[in-house]
């Protein structure tokens, strides 16, 4: 399965993907941080610029998740760890759901709180959903094996 296709979900696997979700987020965060660092350098923004650089990185992070999840149902981090975002009914995560998930990432990840709100919500909900998932009616599940697509 390639990054640029929507894999078929394995519904009912949301309980066993929590650590993969964390790993996928770490991968995605590193990708955005590296890209943001390069962009900051290219735009000659000073890291000491504080809030401007942080705002740019937050915007990049939100756009990254919105574009990848809305287009492919997964980010590169989720892809590498065999995960996909779908609706509770097993339908593809579209741009509407991706926008809701991305917007609520700000609360799930409260700056400086290391995603503690999202992690607590994931552990307290039956379908292992963070606030963005609950609002968008989505779940993160394992992707089907190679060759199976939505």
How should each PLM-predicted stretch be described?
Residues 1-150:
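Membrane-interfacial and juxtamembrane segments of integral membrane proteins
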């Amino acid at each position: 399965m390639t990054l640029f296709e929507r894999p078929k979900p394995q519904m009912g696997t949301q309980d066993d993907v929590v650590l993969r979700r964390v790993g996928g987020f770490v991968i995605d965060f590193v990708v955005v941080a590296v890209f943001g660092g390069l962009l900051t350098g290219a735009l000659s923004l000073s890291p000491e610029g504080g809030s401007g650089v942080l705002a740019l990185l937050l915007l990049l992070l939100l756009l990254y998740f919105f574009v990848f999840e809305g287009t492919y149902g997964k980010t590169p981090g989720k892809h590498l760890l065999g995960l996909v975002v779908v609706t509770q009914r097993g339908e593809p995560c579209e741009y509407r759901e991706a926008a809701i998930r991305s917007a609520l990432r700000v609360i799930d990840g409260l700056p400086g709180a290391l995603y503690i709100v999202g992690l607590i919500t994931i552990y307290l909900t039956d379908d292992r959903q963070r606030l963005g998932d609950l609002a968008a009616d989505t779940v993160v599940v394992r992707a089907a094996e190679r060759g199976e697509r939505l």
